[in-house]
Amino acid sequence: KNTFKEINFDSYKKNIEIHLNSYVWIAKSIADQMKKNNISGSIIQLSSMYGLVAQDDNLYKNTNISENMTYGIIKSSTIHFTKQMASYYGKYNIRVNNLVIGGIKGHIKGSKKKQDKIFLKNFNFKVPLKRMGKSQEIPSSVIFLASSASSYITGSNIVIDGGYSII
């Protein structure tokens, strides 16, 4: 973990390399292949509400969870990278947009464990819709961005976070 209380520089660099640099190179490679082959279309990237807002330590009170500064840095970078890509690749009729996803109930990355009950209570109290999102609430936005219905949308963030980022 890389928190403001405790950071391991090697872990920090590894996270940036895996979760930011690979993201950039893969997305750029795809866009370059589309450009080279004269393929127009839509690239849909994924980010997190923590790319828009800082993590709130109050959500983690009385849990074994803590903020992760590296995560926020990476996610805010991916949001801006989407805008940079959209600006450059637009002239090739390649649209680049981002889904900015908030808390989704039921999973902890890389684990079969359920989310901490105290964290869920804290999160649900804060978010305007008073609940976490459901995984089935994401695909319709992907379908929209991939379709011709969004043909004049590029460089945008569709925020799916129950209103968390507005407060």
Task: Name each model-derived stretch.
Residues 1-16, 57, 67, 110, ...:
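Substrate-binding pocket helix/loop in short-chain dehydrogenase/reductase
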Residues 27-28, 83:
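A short, exposed helix-loop element centered on a Lys and neighboring polar residues
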Residues 56-61, 91, 98-127:
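A glycine/serine/threonine-rich, flexible loop-to-helix segment
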Residues 127-138, 149:
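A conserved structural motif in NAD(P)-dependent oxidoreductases
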Residues 142-143, 154-167:
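Short C-terminal tail/terminal secondary-structure segment
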